[in-house]
C-alpha cells in the first residue's frame, strides 16, 4: 500500500511540543557529533557536539545558477567584499513536520528525540559560538525546521546583542513554510526586531506544484499552496527574504508548463522573488543515498534537469 501522507496540521504541533520550552526559553538542538550526519561533515563538529561549520559555496553544477545564499546577504549586511565562499556556524533544531526524501539530515534527528539532542537556551548557543577561535561571521539556525520554533530567532538576536557581537554577526535561518507560528507565537515587537537586525531568512519551496510538493515532502499536497500564502504574509514583516526551491518530481509530463506557472506565481507574489530564489540541485549521497537505496530515482532527477532548463530560460540565464 502507498505510504500515508503526513497531515502537516497535526504533525507540526506535535513536533513543536517536543523541541521548545517557552517558559525557560530552551530549544532542543540536535547532537550532530556521533550521529550519521557527522560522517558527511568535512570539518570537525564543535560547540560540545551541537554545532558544525558549513562552507557555503557560490559555484554549483554546470547548467545551474550560482548559489549566492547566504553569501551576498551576509556581505551586504556586514560590509564585506564579494566572496566565492563563506563559512557559517550551524546549529540544527531537532524536529521537522516533513520527511523530504532528499534531506541531508538523518530522519532520526528530525523527531525531537532527547536521546540525540540537548536542551539549550539561545544565550548558551551564542556563548559557544562566541568562544570559537576565528568564528565564522554567519550564524546559521537550521534544522530540522526552524519555523517550528520561531522564538529561536528573536531570542538569538537578543543574545547576540547582550554578547556584544550583533554588529559583526549575520544571522541566517531557513524556513520550511510549514506553519503560521511566526504570526501565532511571536509578538509584533519580536517580528520588528527580526526586520531591524542583521538577519536574513530563506524560505524553502518544496516543489513547483502540488504533485511535486507531496512527492518531495511526504506531506499532503495542499501544503504547496500554503507555502506560497505564508511567504506572501512574511513580506509584510520587512525581513530580508530569499527562497530555495527543489525541482524534483514524480512525473516528467508537462514539466515546462508546470515550472513556468510556478515561476509566474512567484513573480505575482513579489516581482523580485524569482531572482532571489536559488534552485538547489538534489544529489544522492550520504544519508540520502542510504535512505533511498533500491529506489528508482531516475525520473525524479530527470525532472529536475528538465525543470532547471526552464527556470534558467525564464530567469534570462543560459542553461
Go through each PLM region and give its residues:
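Auxiliary Fe-S-binding modules of radical SAM enzymes
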Residues: 1-47, 222, 229-319
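Short helix-capping segments at alpha-helix termini
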Residues: 162-167, 269-273
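Core AdoMet radical
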Residues: 107-120, 132-156, 163-226, 242
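N-terminal [4Fe-4S]-dependent radical SAM core
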Residues: 10-92, 101, 105-111
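Short N-terminal secondary-structure initiator segments
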Residues: 30-49, 136-157, 177-187, 279-294
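A general structural detector for well-ordered alpha-helical segments in enzyme core domains, enriched
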Residues: 125-128, 155-160, 189-190, 226-230, ...
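A glycine-rich, hydrophobic loop/mini-helix early in the fold
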Residues: 82-134, 259
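Short, solvent-exposed loop/turn segments at secondary-structure junctions
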Residues: 97, 208, 248-250
Amino acid at each position: 500500500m502507498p505510504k500515508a501522507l503526513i497531515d502537516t496540521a497535526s504533525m507540526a504541533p506535535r513536533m513543536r511540543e517536543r523541541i521548545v520550552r517557552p517558559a525557560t526559553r530552551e530549544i532542543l538542538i540536535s547532537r550532530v557529533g556521533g550521529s550519521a550526519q557527522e560522517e558527511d561533515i568535512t570539518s570537525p563538529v564543535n560547540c560540545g557536539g551541537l554545532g558544525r561549520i558549513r562552507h557555503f559555496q557560490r559555484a554549483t553544477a554546470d547548467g545551474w545558477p550560482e548559489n549566492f545564499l547566504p553569501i551576498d546577504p551576509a556581505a551586504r549586511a556586514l560590509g564585506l567584499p564579494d566572496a566565492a565562499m563563506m563559512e557559517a556556524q550551524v546549529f540544527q533544531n531537532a524536529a521537522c513536520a516533513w520527511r523530504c526524501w532528499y534531506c541531508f539530515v538523518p530522519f532520526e534527528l528530525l523527531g525531537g528525540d532527547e536521546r540525540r539532542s540537548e536542551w539549550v537556551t539561545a544565550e548558551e548557543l551564542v556563548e559557544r559560538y562566541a568562544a570559537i577561535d576565528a568564528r565564522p561571521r554567519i550564524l546559521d539556525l537550521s534544522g530540522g525546521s526552524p519555523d517550528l520554533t520561531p522564538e529561536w530567532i528573536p531570542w538569538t538576536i537578543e543574545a547576540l546583542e547582550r554578547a556584544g557581537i550583533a554588529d559583526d554577526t549575520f544571522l541566517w535561518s531557513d524556513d520550511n513554510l510549514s506553519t503560521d507560528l511566526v504570526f501565532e507565537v511571536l509578538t509584533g515587537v519580536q517580528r520588528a526586531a527580526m526586520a531591524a537586525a542583521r538577519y536574513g531568512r530563506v524560505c524553502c519551496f518544496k516543489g513547483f506544484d502540488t504533485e511535486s510538493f507531496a512527492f518531495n515532502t511526504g506531506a499532503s499536497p495542499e501544503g504547496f499552496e500554503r507555502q506560497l500564502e505564508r511567504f506572501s504574509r512574511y513580506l509584510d514583516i520587512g525581513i530580508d527574504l530569499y527562497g530555495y526551491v527543489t525541482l524534483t518530481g514524480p512525473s516528467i509530463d508537462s514539466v515546462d508548463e508546470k515550472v513556468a506557472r510556478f515561476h509566474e506565481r512567484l513573480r505575482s507574489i513579489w516581482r523580485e522573488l524569482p531572482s532571489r530564489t536559488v534552485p538547489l540541485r538534489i544529489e544522492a549521497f550520504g544519508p540520502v543515498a542510504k535512505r533511498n537505496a533500491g529506489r528508482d530515482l531516475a525520473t525524479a532527477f530527470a525532472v529536475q534537469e528538465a525543470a532547471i532548463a526552464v527556470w534558467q530560460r525564464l530567469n534570462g540565464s543560459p542553461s
